[in-house]
Curated annotation (Swiss-Prot):
This is Galectin-1. A carbohydrate binds at residues 51, 55, 64, 75. One of its GO terms (biological process) is sporocarp development. The keyword Transmembrane helix does not apply. Disulfide bonds: none annotated. It is found in: Secreted, Extracellular space, Extracellular matrix; Secreted, Cell wall; Endomembrane system. The gene is Cgl1. It comes from Coprinopsis cinerea. The keyword RNA-binding does not apply. Most abundant in fruiting bodies. Very low levels of expression in asexual vegetative mycelia. Binds lactose. May play a role in fruiting body formation. Induction: Repressed by continuous light.
Length: 150
């Protein structure tokens, strides 16, 4: 399923994002002078299952989770520098059931262990001066079946 997600908005997913699903967020531009840009994967109860906060000013990409109205957990960080290489950056999230695998421009950055065991029902995108286009495209599908033996 393909969606268009505008900055400072969210999309409700037609089907839950759950184990064995892949979400790819693609931008038509990369604004290297952009500021903090955030993507949140939210449950139907508005818990933030996966928070991806791209912070160029801190040279960090922060991952976290929290229940609606609850406190943030401990941050997990990776360096920002060099994560987005092309003019059309992408973020891919694979749901492995017990953890998320997050890739930037098709390179794995982190495996983030799920802290809240729910499915995502929405994805939010926020920024004051986004690194990415508005809208971005969000493509959600299941994992491809294994290839037959050669």
């Amino acid at each position: 399923m393909l969606y268009h997600l505008f900055v400072n908005n969210q999309i409700k997913l037609q089907d839950d994002f759950k184990a064995e699903a892949v979400a790819t967020i693609r931008s038509s531009v990369f604004n290297s002078k952009g500021g903090t840009t955030v993507f949140n994967f939210l449950s139907a109860g508005e818990n933030i299952l996966l928070h991806i906060s791209i912070r160029p000013g801190e040279n960090a990409i922060v991952f976290n989770s929290r229940t609606k109205g609850g406190a943030w957990g401990p941050e997990e960080r990776v360096p920002y520098a060099g994560k987005f290489k092309g003019p059309n950056p992408s973020i891919t999230v694979l749901d492995h059931g017990d953890r998320f695998q997050i890739l930037f421009d098709n390179a794995t950055a982190i495996y983030y262990t799920k802290r809240i065991k729910e499915n995502a029902a929405a994805i939010a995108y926020s920024a004051e001066n986004s690194l990415f286009s508005s809208p971005v495209t969000v493509d959600i599908h299941g994992l491809l079946p294994p290839l037959p033996p050669a």
